[in-house]
């Protein structure tokens, strides 16, 4: 449907047939022969549907502020005991204190903006392992499994976004994502008969949501205003921001009406919070996957929520459901670095919230 950059609605109404409920069952071990056999069958199906490239879109929690605690600090929110009476909230906030949750240990020293390069990805593989991270082993396993038949080759690439969790960071991330997909189109000689499958983890799904609005086929005064506002503010940065070239690339793509020869973008989000709305006219197919526990006595499973961790030790296991997906909604953005960035972010917010 047409969305035109509107914020997604927080609705309690029954989604009906648009939602399904699955129970996780233990399957075969990753990278085993049985796993490869299953991927081979899936790869043939994907290839037959036109998929030629899979993009693993992700960021990292290292050094980030997932819940906007920096802004709470500005008003003293973390110091006023506002969590009183909310089971589990105090244990969650225990990792949001200044110089604790928001920073990597001093001997690690890597924090956003992350570079989408081999060195950064290798560093994350070593320290984050597979916690919110698409590792090189996973990328290679998917590529080899899906393409086990020489007649059905499917490329698999990782795209690490900056992990700057605010409107400016995500918008620039969407520009960069489009630039890299355009590069993949040329590299693999893709056209309108092909499909690119994007698997977006967590906050990275917001980039795909913005991209769906940027690539909308219909005219959009909001899109025009966003481009003009962003370009105007970019002119004040010294040195120029690298994303300006990517913004110009999107603008030129739309002006030349190149959507007709561009591969369809199918998107699967994994635990992405409800933030930006989706314009399904600008993409192919869309699927959201959320890890919650739909246990309710009234039968309204779509209203199920996660259970907050009761102690800090429970936080990495997510036994009560995906609390990051539930809590990282509007007004939880990270603090920006400079007044000029804050000004541009505020200008974007007027059209995105």
Residue ranges of model-derived segments:
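Serine-dependent carboxylesterase/thioesterase catalytic core
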Residues: 1, 167, 171-315
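Aromatic-residue detector
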Residues: 1, 24-26, 82-99, 112-115, ...
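Terminal low-complexity/disordered tails
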Residues: 1-44, 252-254, 315-353
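Amphipathic alpha-helical oligomerization segments
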Residues: 47-50
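C-terminal catalytic-base region of ester-bond hydrolases, centering on the histidine
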Residues: 55-57, 67, 89-92, 99-110, ...
